Amino acid sequence: MNEELRRKNEGITQDSSSLLIPHSSLTIENLVAGYPGRVLVRNLFLYLPAAGFVAVVGHNGSGKTTLFRVLTGQLPYEGRVQLLGQEIRTLRRTAAAGLLGYLPQRGTIDFAIAVRELVVMGRYRHHGLLSAYNPADYALADAALARVGMAHLAARDFTQLSGGEQQLVWLAQLSLQDAQVYLLDEPTQQLDVYYRRQVFGLLHDWATNHGKTVLCSTHDLDNLPELTGHLLNLSEPEPQLRPLSAATVLQARHWLERAPAPARS
């Protein structure tokens, strides 16, 4: 069964499997993770290619955030989890190494800061603790803001922006980390229709045009059929990658309209 799940997730044949596995950006085998008395992810197998977009869906409590906490090294786990061929539990600073970029669920900043100054902080791994950002860093920040359509707000106070504008600024900062794998935990939460489409469009562009692996947890199913990539529904008993399409999104919607399964101990 484990081998069958692996092949379903990769969409490969017997002859091609040995060629594709070494190029996986993320390999998960028999993952078990959760919290005392409550297992949220059990026996998960997942093999992601070196580039692509993956929408991670599921009920609240199905393990979406738990999976991301494992991948960012914040939560112990059982099983095998390899990021670009390296076991996660042996990596101390995936972000500093340029392997992984992570945008958690929307937070707040309670102090005034110019948008440009916030975005340039995405270059932190290229500098020492006390070194200053240079003109080249700011040029990259300006380019990142232009790509997300926020260049005209570079001098504005970030705290005065709308929720959608703030999220695009966070994406600009995240892009400056230039990681191979990006995790985004519900990046369209509480955004209106326009900004949800903007965010998904940017993430899809990272995967299809810039060779990044993008995992995006979301409850927003409406925009997914328009994207190219895969869908992972953690509410299924045996989650597996499925191509994104109107049919697979509808299937996921039917799953999510059911009552969630009881938490496992």
Predicted regions, residues:
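Conserved ABC ATPase "signature" region
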Residues: 120, 135-153
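Helix-to-loop junction immediately C-terminal to a conserved catalytic motif
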Residues: 72
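Conserved ABC ATPase signature
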Residues: 157-161, 165
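The feature captures the beta-strand-to-loop junction immediately N-terminal to the Walker
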Residues: 57-59
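H-loop/switch region of ABC-family ATPase nucleotide-binding domains
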Residues: 218-219
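Catalytic Walker B motif of ABC-type/P-loop ATPase nucleotide-binding domains
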Residues: 182-186
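Conserved ABC transporter NBD signature motif
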Residues: 79-87, 96
